[in-house]
Amino acid sequence: MSVLTPLLLRGLTGSARRLPMPCARVHSKPPREQLGTMDIAIGLTSCFVCFLLPSGWVLSHLENYKKRE
């Protein structure tokens, strides 16, 4: 990294710091229905099956992908 990089970044972000930032006032209503234990279990299981299971399979078979046939 160059010595000038921090100076360049400071120059680019300096003008953005002076802009007024409006404060967001976000309010929401309470939920219509409380989530039950079964709903949470189904949600966590579906996240595991959709995201973690395929990535775990790819990572466990990584050596097979590296080999040239």
UniProtKB/Swiss-Prot annotation:
Post-translational modification: In response to mitochondrial stress, the precursor protein is ubiquitinated by the SIFI complex in the cytoplasm before mitochondrial import, leading to its degradation. Within the SIFI complex, UBR4 initiates ubiquitin chain that are further elongated or branched by KCMF1.
Compartments where located: Mitochondrion inner membrane
Its membrane topology: Single-pass membrane protein
Residue ranges of the TM segments: 37-60
Protein's name according to its UniProt entry: Cytochrome c oxidase subunit 8A, mitochondrial
Taxonomy, superkingdom: Eukaryota
Name of the coding gene: COX8A
A cellular component term, taken from the record's GO annotations: respiratory chain complex IV
Pfam families: COX8
